[in-house]
A protein has these predicted regions:
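Phosphate/dinucleotide-binding and metal-coordinating scaffold of catalytic cores
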Residues: 22-276
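Bacterial N-terminal signal peptides
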Residues: 10-20
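Bacterial N-terminal signal peptides that target proteins for export
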Residues: 1-12
Length: 276
């Protein structure tokens, strides 16, 4: 559970057919835009909901139906705020674990043009409580299961390029809970980042500088564009303190990669991640 991201770059052992690796659903969902997924999540009827056996409390899977499309969603209502929290990773002051950060992470991913790696998430009341309702990634396996089975991506370069995005994003949002259950792998071996309820800390430092290795060229450009005005799109799910910390970390991340490019050259540091 506490493995670092650096340990998540396997050598290619073999390429297995996705149909053998993932449990298939009866009918694949049609390709939708993010806006269409958001609308579905906010308006479709919840026909069934149950607690998840994996993960934290206040986490459920709902089956949604709008009369045309049926799809599942991840429903989270956790909203804890503690002055002091004692966890397995030590003591944390000003601890926050909230559904609101899931929506903030999705909106931030949109600003960075990496919302093809963070599933759509919207606010909706479920059983009278405000929740984050997040698009369910069909036919996926968790990173923890991939490691247990000894499976590796058939395209190590594509895998690494997506994992570098994960690293940069987690340092930007100061994610304290990126574990092997919070990364999903779909049948095309694309990585999805989920469950950001313990992110957006107030710190201005970088949590794990060693995790910054390479960066997608477009992502670096989008990082430069972030400012208080654009990040207002994340409110009310994060406040001014979280935005201030995020921008300070952004400055450090951009400066780090700029210095690395000067020292090692663009080819060693920057790459172009293809569209998914």
């Amino acid at each position: 559970m506490n493995s670092t991201l650096r340990k998540w770059f396997p050598l290619v052992l073999f390429a297995a057919a996705p149909a053998l690796l993932f449990a298939q659903e009866k009918q694949a969902a049609p390709k939708l835009t993010n806006e269409q997924m958001e609308h579905f999540l906010q308006t479709a009827k919840i026909v069934k909901i149950k607690e998840l056996s994996v993960g934290v409390t206040d986490s459920r899977r709902a089956n949604l139906d709008d009369g045309t499309l049926q799809h599942s969603a991840h429903v989270q209502s956790i909203d804890e705020h503690k002055a002091k929290f004692e966890g397995e990773r030590g003591t944390e002051m000003n601890f926050v674990d909230t559904w609101m950060y899931n929506i903030a992470a999705y909106r931030l991913a949109g600003l960075l043009d990496i919302n093809d790696m963070v599933p759509a998430s919207v606010e909706r009341k479920v059983d009278g409580k405000p929740c984050a309702v997040t698009w369910w990634i069909d036919d996926s396996m968790m990173e923890v299961d991939r490691k247990k089975k000894g499976l590796s991506s058939p395209d190590p370069d594509a895998w690494n390029h997506e994992m570098y995005v994960v690293r940069v994003f987690d340092q930007l949002i100061w994610n304290t809970d990126r574990n092997l259950q919070n990364l999903l792998i779909d049948p095309a071996w694309h990585i999805w980042m989920i469950d950001h309820t313990r992110a957006f800390r107030l710190y201005t430092s970088i949590k794990e500088p060693k995790d910054l290795v390479m960066c997608d060229r477009k992502l670096l450009g989008k990082l430069r564009e972030l400012d208080a005005k654009s990040l207002a799109a994340l409110k009310p799910y994060i406040g001014n303190g979280e935005i201030k910390g995020l921008l300070a970390r952004r400055d450090k991340i951009v400066a780090f990669f700029d210095n690395q490019v000067k020292a090692k050259g663009e080819a060693a540091i920057l790459y172009d991640r293809p569209a998914r």
